[in-house]
Amino acid sequence: MSNVTILTPAANKKLTTLEQIKQELEITNSTDDAFLNDLIDRMSGRIEDFCHRIFAKQTYQEKVAGFGDKILILTHTPVLSVLSVLCDSSPITDYEIYNANAGELYRSIGWAWDPTMWWGASAFPSSHHSEQNFTVVYEAGYVLPGDDEAQTLPKTIEDACIQCVKEAYLKRRDDPNVSSEKLGNYSVTYDPTPLLSRLLYNWVRIF
């Protein structure tokens, strides 16, 4: 179990840009810009919900229970940097990012909750105990299209967002799906789940 707080939220969570959408749709005017931006926001949110994860780079504080294992797993990935780790109120520095994409921090003596285990008296995990005694401050996520830094968001995810926005835009007048949303004075009915299931199956977080 863990308890996560966002310390520095992302200013931008759009998984693609208006420019990319207009290029895909071969649109050269600005008539539908506001509508398209709304669709980008909505489809980016739907992708986050579908994948059970936040893709934008943010800074988190996470309280995690240690069970004596050598790996501590953080919720948000990829882990870009770890700013601090505390055991209760004591700083810990003898760790390393073991697998950034899996959110794994490695510590050779283990991440133990019990003080006697912390000092190496035992290497056995105490799985019955769920005290959140480690506090980790870390940065995780991707640089998104439209951010000032070079994009690190995988193109597969951006392409999925582009296709969702494109299909929603083109189905404004004739859509057989059942979910309906209203953007401004225009009603849009579009369910991207089948498309997302096909394109982003490998990106769905299962825990």
PLM feature spans:
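Divalent metal-cofactor coordination and adjacent catalytic microenvironments
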Residues: 1-207
